[in-house]
A protein has these predicted regions:
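Gram-negative outer-membrane beta-barrel transporters
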Residues: 1-5, 13-16, 20-108
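Residue-level preference for alpha-helix termini and adjacent loops
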Residues: 6, 46, 73, 135, ...
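Short, glycine/charged-rich beta-strand-loop motifs at protein surfaces that mediate ligand recognition
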Residues: 126-133, 140-144
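C-terminal beta-signal and adjacent terminal beta-strands/loops
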Residues: 101-120, 138, 144-178
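Asparagine-centered polar/low-complexity signal
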Residues: 26-27, 60, 129, 159-165
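Surface-exposed loop/turn and secondary-structure junction residues enriched for glycine/proline
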Residues: 10-14, 29-31, 50, 75-77, ...
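Generic secondary-structure boundary/loop-capping signal
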Residues: 4-8, 23-25, 133, 157, ...
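Solvent-exposed loop segments that connect transmembrane elements
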Residues: 10-24, 65, 112-126, 171-177
């Protein structure tokens, strides 16, 4: 468990675009975080590898927001990493590796509705960081073979099952829908 004082975040409805006084759009508070990490590895034999899992939670508290807790962007409760490596052949000239990663998605604030007054659009947002993006996960495979005394042939396939992981989220608007 850890408490961090003097964290900085934006005020609600911050106006940061082309703002020469950005400091007026910032506020301070504190954060609480806790978690646990587990790790196991196998370092000998033809098959080696490791598994790592982390569970962590964080909550921010900002006085100007009523001291209500909210999850920060970096609150990603689950992180799992698995790495396996197998050395094949009598002389172990080729190695086959697999890496799997899973991470909870990031928190974000999204517009949930909008209305117009005299042609100007106004947005209504979800609670601060009230949505979590989809989880990120991928499987990568590789083969490395020694060729001669110094050469190596490496073949890698990234994101084997072609997961469309979310890197960032953009909202778009039209007159009827988001």
């Amino acid at each position: 468990y850890r408490k961090t004082n003097h964290i900085v975040d934006f005020v609600d409805n911050a106006n940061i675009f082309l703002n020469n006084q950005i400091e007026t759009q910032l506020t301070t508070g504190y954060s609480k975080a806790y978690g646990a990490e587990f790790y196991i590895s196998k370092n000998s034999g033809r098959l080696t590898g490791w598994i790592s899992y982390t569970f962590s939670r964080a909550r921010n508290y900002i006085a100007t927001l009523g001291d209500k807790e909210y999850p920060p962007v970096y609150d990603r409760p689950h992180s799992l990493k698995i790495f396996l490596n197998y050395e094949a052949g009598r002389k172990r000239r080729c190695a086959f590796a697999a890496t799997f990663s899973y991470n909870s998605g990031m928190n974000l604030t999204l517009p949930i509705a909008h209305y117009r007054v005299n042609g100007t659009a106004f947005y209504i947002y979800s609670t601060r960081n009230g949505y979590r993006a989809p989880a990120f996960h991928e499987l990568n495979l590789s083969m490395t073979c020694k060729t001669g005394k110094r050469g190596r042939l490496i073949l890698s396939v990234m994101n084997v099952y072609n997961r469309k992981n979310v890197f960032t989220i953009y909202t778009s608007r039209d007159d009827y829908d988001f």
